[in-house]
Regions:
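Cytosolic-facing loops and C-terminal tails of multi-pass membrane proteins
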Residues: 232-233
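Nucleotide and nucleotide-moiety/phosphate-recognizing core
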Residues: 2-168, 172-211, 218-222, 229
């Protein structure tokens, strides 16, 4: 089965906002390496050649909203911002709302706090999913944990699964779909011609930072910032 072209996928970014473990801060807007994390995710989506970026979360004021729009301006389908109903209903509700805006046959499901995500890695996971014969592909970390919010899916099987799923867990929804598992290192950086190698605007993260590294608490945020500082040239 041939790999799909990168333009055949949209991206759904779950960017719900306030985080209890971050003292109520707007986590996606927190900066790592001089840029808000959600801007870094959007830049990776654009570099991967997505058709459109769908952000599920509140409208961002200040500098974040215009910066997000600027990054997505080059996408054929542009930027779409929506909210799950009711707001704060959880990741499955957010995915359901975001999926309703997907027009491509594939989608990337992404968190908004992935400062080390790159376009080349995202395209590599997409290629693995497309060639696997399965409904999607999910990276698996060294501890065997599936990283649902850095995964790629066929839109129609995901819609069908959502139609009958009544729970609130992403793992409960996505696990039974039996996606291809992408081991650490399997989706190699730079394996897709024509895309920039590892590195991101505002800093060059060191090689050991995995693309699915997220920042769920202050310690992880501090670790991400330190990695960017260590990698700056």
């Amino acid at each position: 089965m041939p790999a799909s072209r990168p333009a055949d996928f949209d991206a759904v970014m779950l960017a719900g906002g306030r985080a209890a473990r971050m003292d109520g801060a707007d986590k996606p807007a927190l900066e790592v390496g001089g840029l808000p994390m959600m801007i870094r995710v959007a830049a990776a989506v654009a570099a991967a050649g997505a058709g459109r970026l769908i952000v599920v979360g509140p409208d961002r004021g200040g500098a974040v909203g215009p910066a997000l729009a600027a990054v997505a301006a080059g996408l054929p389908g542009g930027l779409v911002t929506v909210r799950e109903s009711p707001p704060g209903a959880g990741p499955v509700a957010a995915l359901r709302r975001g999926l309703s805006e997907v027009r491509a046959p594939w989608l990337a499901l992404l968190a908004a706090d992935l400062p080390f995500l790159t376009g080349s890695w995202l395209r590599a996971v997409h290629a693995i999913a497309a060639s696997s014969g399965r409904p999607g592909a999910v990276p698996v970390d060294d501890g065997g944990r599936q990283q649902w919010l850095a995964s790629v899916w066929r839109a129609e099987p995901l819609r069908s699964a959502l139609d009958v799923y009544t729970g609130g867990s992403l793992g409960g929804l996505l696990g039974p779909m039996e996606p291809a598992r992408v081991a650490a290192g399997q989706a190699q950086e730079g394996s897709t011609p024509g895309l920039a190698p590892r590195g991101a605007p505002g800093g060059r993260p060191p090689e050991l930072a995995p693309p699915w590294f997220d920042c769920d608490d202050p310690a992880e945020l501090a670790a991400a910032r330190a990695r960017f500082e260590d990698g700056d040239t």
